[in-house]
Amino acid sequence: DVTFSLLGANTKSYAAFITNFRKDVASEKK
């Protein structure tokens, strides 16, 4: 299903966004 594929891609992008966001927050706290 195309919708499912898009959802999977969005989930991966969201996970990467959260990871990068946490890295940025950690960097600013130092």
From Swiss-Prot:
Its EC number is 3.2.2.22. Keywords: Glycoprotein, Hydrolase, Plant defense, Protein synthesis inhibitor, Toxin. Glycosylated. It is an enzyme of class 3 (hydrolase). InterPro entries: Ribosome-inact_prot_sf. The keyword Heme does not apply. It catalyses: Endohydrolysis of the N-glycosidic bond at one specific adenosine on the 28S rRNA. GO terms for molecular function: rRNA N-glycosylase activity; toxin activity. GO terms for biological process: defense response; negative regulation of translation. Inactivates eukaryotic 60S ribosomal subunits. Belongs to the ribosome-inactivating protein family. Type 1 RIP subfamily. This is Ribosome-inactivating protein momorcochin-S. It comes from Momordica cochinchinensis (Spiny bitter cucumber).
